[in-house]
Amino acid sequence: MVWSSNMSSFLLILLILNSTHFSLMANGRPEPDSVEFTKSGDQDVKMMMRGLIGSRPPRCERVRCRSCGHCEAIQVPTNPQTKLHSPLTTSSSSSSETIHLDYTRGDDSTNYKPMSWKCKCGNSIYNP
């Protein structure tokens, strides 16, 4: 009788330990050889591409680009514009002049050169 009681206790403890083992199993990333990995692999690539910093090149498929045959997306520097208010103007007159800056550093605090995407078709450059 003692043997069956000990055996029952042992089996009960073993059953409890095994059931908690499966419920507490870590669910990490799937292994590369598994079927789950190939299904979620495409979604991971899409999510990673969305998280990249910066802009994407445009699709240069407009009417302008069809005439030359080969059209490609390129990055070109933009010309920043700064509006300066004349010190002689009063608050009632709001005249301002626009000055084009060719990548001058100004206060020597930055060397930022903004770039934008354009479509290049032969020797011509178009807005996308």
Curated annotation (Swiss-Prot):
Region annotation (Disordered) ranges: 79-100
Classification via Pfam families: EPF
GO cellular component: extracellular region
Keywords attached to this entry: Developmental protein, Disulfide bond, Secreted, Signal
UniProt keyword NAD, yes or no: no
Summary of the function given for this chain in its UniProt record: Controls stomatal patterning.
Similarity annotation: Belongs to the plant cysteine rich small secretory peptide family. Epidermal patterning factor subfamily.
Protein name (Swiss-Prot/TrEMBL): EPIDERMAL PATTERNING FACTOR-like protein 2
Underlying gene: EPFL2
